[in-house]
Amino acid sequence: LEGADGAGTTTQAELIRSSLAAGGIDAQVTAQPSKGPIGTLLRSVLRGKITRDDGRRIGGRAIAALFAADRSEHIESLIEPLLSEGVHVICDRYYHSSFAYQGLEVGLDYAAAVNAPMKTPDLILFVDVDVDVALQRRDSRATEQELYEVEAIQSRLREAYHTAFRLR
């Protein structure tokens, strides 16, 4: 599932998992950034808790590479083992999110290049909602704001998702 912050991907992923379970189909929801060591590091970078030595935020290319590294580790440590056991995997965000989010800063070509080796999903669902609705949902959550969760980026982000899906 792909979509901007506040689009409802997490809610939809759980609804899909529940529906599959009701039909006797084994499925697990997972998310990116992952809860693994690289994903944890990445969340600290996105929240501004880890910065460059001079206090400035980590650059866009490094962030894109961290997302790709987290995704690669997530595939190897969790997604592939689940799939080999016959479990359906519902991923709350995958590489199209990098095309949209990191593509805004470093360009779609770079974001696509660092994600080129990733396993291709069988199905991609894009949850597209109005920017104001997404902002309202996001603002109602009691979570720390991350780098890409600023209002000025949200309409550009929605268009970036649309562009990523047209081109890929």
Task: List where the protein language model places each region.
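The conserved Walker
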Residues: 5
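Hydrophobic positions on the alpha1 helix immediately C-terminal to the Walker A/P-loop
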Residues: 12
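ATP-dependent small-molecule kinase phosphotransfer cores
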Residues: 25-116
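Hydrophobic alpha-helical packing residues
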Residues: 16, 20-21
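Conserved lysine of the Walker
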Residues: 9
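A glycine- and Lys/Arg-enriched "phosphate-lid" helix/loop adjacent to the NTP-binding pocket
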Residues: 97-160
